[in-house]
A protein has these predicted regions:
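ABC ATPase NBD coupling module
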Residues: 76-79, 135-151, 177
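Conserved ABC transporter NBD signature motif
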Residues: 125-134
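Conserved ABC ATPase "signature" region
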Residues: 134, 185-202
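Conserved ABC ATPase signature
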Residues: 207-211, 215
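Conserved catalytic motifs of ABC-family nucleotide-binding domains
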Residues: 228
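Catalytic Walker B motif of ABC-type/P-loop ATPase nucleotide-binding domains
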Residues: 232-235
Length: 237
């Protein structure tokens, strides 16, 4: 409906504007009601799974995992819907094995990995058991200890490396933070990790921008392996 038409007086135009505002308000209310119903439905669905018991042969048990991202809309940016990035993923991973998660771009592979590692504050449903522990039930202190056992190699090596830190510090930061190696052995340990990943010891003093894309990915791999983790998520490394 146009704001102005020839031959109409101010009162007529004002009436049309009021009618438009009323229609917009009614539409917003309907969207909000729909969002509220969708949220209630999702909560019912999220609770509709059977918890699994810990099986020692599996290092990781993922049961009906969900991760939804809210869609904001309206004048007050309320939730009007959800993007279901991960919706009911279930699998078990035995110790010492490798599993590939295959799918088209945007299907939720990266989000699945990040949700398993609890790189998000919360999940939308399901279970993530690592060595029998529900990852999302851990305290901050317990989660910090778990970080040494679960690592990720990010898809984009450039954005995941600090441009202000030399490579040696990037690889050894977590090792030093968790006191995994005695100080006297620290430098030799980092040299060995770098050598295992095809990097030279003299690379320690260089910065990420001085390396090629392939070399930067080696740095990311070395950073993950330096902690000697039990489980690694490789996001298309």
């Amino acid at each position: 409906m146009p704001f102005w038409k020839a031959g109409k007086n101010d009162d007529q135009v004002l009436d049309e504007l009021k009618e438009m505002q009323k229609q917009n308000a009614d539409e917003f209310v309907k969207k909000q009601e729909h969002a509220d119903e969708a949220q209630k439905s999702s909560l019912i669905i999220d609770n509709n799974f059977t918890p699994v018991e810990y099986d020692p042969q599996y290092i990781l048990q993922v049961n009906h995992l969900k991760k939804y991202f809210p869609i904001k809309g309206g004048m007050v940016s309320k939730t009007v819907g959800y993007v279901k990035a991960v919706d009911g993923v279930t699998f078990n991973l035995k110790r010492g094995t490798t599993m590939g998660l295959v799918g088209e771009s945007g299907c939720g592979k990266t989000t699945t990995g990040r949700t398993i590692l609890r790189l998000y504050d919360s999940k939308s449903g399901g279970q993530v058991l690592f060595n029998g522990q529900e990852v999302y039930d851990l305290s901050h202190k317990e989660l910090r200890a778990l970080r040494t056992k679960m690592q990720i190699i990010f898809q984009d090596p450039f954005s995941s490396l600090s441009p202000r830190m030399p490579v040696g510090e990037i690889i050894g930061e977590a090792v030093r933070e968790h006191n995994l190696v005695p100080k006297a052995e620290f430098d030799d340990y980092i040299d060995q990790v770098m050598d295992n990943c095809g990097l030279q010891p003299f690379h320690k003093d260089r910065y990420p921008h001085e390396f090629s894309g392939g070399q930067r990915q080696r740095i990311c791999i070395a950073r993950a392996l330096a902690l000697n983790p039990e489980f690694i998520v490789c996001d298309e490394p």
